[in-house]
Regions:
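Conserved alpha-helical scaffold segments that buttress catalytic/binding sites
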Residues: 3-314
């Protein structure tokens, strides 16, 4: 089913025919597509299928739909945290229509702001790394902070998938409110590292994560980014080890383990300052036959939602 409203295309993806139906095993994909009805919205999900500016000529525009389908492989119950997502009210906003067009970023940003006006937390599904920009710009960049999990600093010049951080700095984001987690040796140039330091970014390299642990690094990153306002968290899955994220063309051996990524996702969802999250740089057309990267991205959605369910009461 497909319908369109105000530049957003909404898709209700049916459960894959190969999956059995069991009323006692509710699927997370059904939970998301059911919507909130008349209830206040807890979690909104918006697809931003950017791909045209990618240096890798990737098929990232196929990924939002792939993540939605992958959610059908999981249930709504998180046993270790005693959380059932049926207690949260979701809203699948749909996909921004052709976000790579000249007016695409404007329409994506408008869709983000519409969702934020109704939901406690928004997750956008990219798309290449350029999808980070309109998602973060849904917040007031004069006050907002950013936590970026990425194998590199997106500080290249030009309007590309690897220039999101540069674009946000140009739009008014201050480096002192930016935290970066997971940068790897041999993936960051000396020039970019010097700029990140000069701008006052809080940096937690892959080595720091290994030494301190992902939970401690995320706690420090979120605290630094959230010092004066709401926070956007960007999950560029190229931060992961290539063995678990083969659909991320920049992923390297030695990156984050899947469990570390999911711990970070839960921390983002649980932090009261976090208002927006994105998942980017997954090319569903380049995934392994078992769709491990797409399924990992779907688990990021669920872990963020679990964190939201366990946020401290205001």
């Amino acid at each position: 089913m497909v319908w369109k409203h105000a530049g957003v295309v909404s898709r209700a993806d049916p459960v894959p025919e190969s999956l059995p139906v069991d009323e006692r095993w509710p699927r997370a994909g059904h939970w998301l597509s059911a919507g909130a009805g008349r209830h206040p919205i807890d979690l909104a999900v918006l697809g931003v299928p950017t791909f045209a500016r990618s240096l890798n000529k990737a098929g990232t525009h196929t990924t939002p739909a792939a993540i939605r389908r992958a959610l059908h492989h999981y249930t709504t119950w998180c046993a270790s945290r005693h959380v059932d997502l049926v207690d949260l009210w979701p809203w699948d906003v749909g996909d921004v229509d052709e976000p790579d067009r000249d007016d695409g970023a404007f329409r994506a940003q408008a869709a983000v702001k519409t969702a934020l006006a109704k939901a406690r937390l928004l997750v956008t599904l990219g798309g290449d790394g350029s999808a980070t920009v309109p998602t973060a710009q849904g917040l007031d960049l004069k006050q907002a902070g950013l936590v970026a999990l990425d194998v590199q600093y997106d500080l290249r010049d030009g309007a590309r998938n690897t220039s999101a951080l540069r674009t946000l700095f140009d739009a008014g984001l201050e480096g002192e409110r930016v935290s970066h987690v997971g940068a790897a040796d041999w993936a960051v140039s000396r020039s970019h590292a010097d700029e990140a330091k000069a701008r006052g970014m809080a940096r937690f390299s892959r080595g720091a994560v290994e030494e301190r642990g992902i939970a401690a690094c995320m706690a420090a990153a979120l605290e630094s980014a959230g010092q004066s306002g709401p926070v956007h968290v960007s999950f560029d899955l190229s931060v992961c080890d290539r063995a678990v994220a083969p659909a991320c063309l920049d992923a390297m051996p030695g990156g984050l383990r899947a469990a570390e990524l999911l711990t970070a996702a839960f921390a983002a969802g649980r932090d009261p300052n976090v208002r927006t999250v994105d998942i980017v740089e997954v090319d569903a057309t380049a995934d392994a036959p078992d769709y491990r990267t797409v399924r990992l991205a779907a688990l990021v959605v669920l872990e963020v939602a679990a964190g939201l369910a366990l946020r401290p009461q205001a």
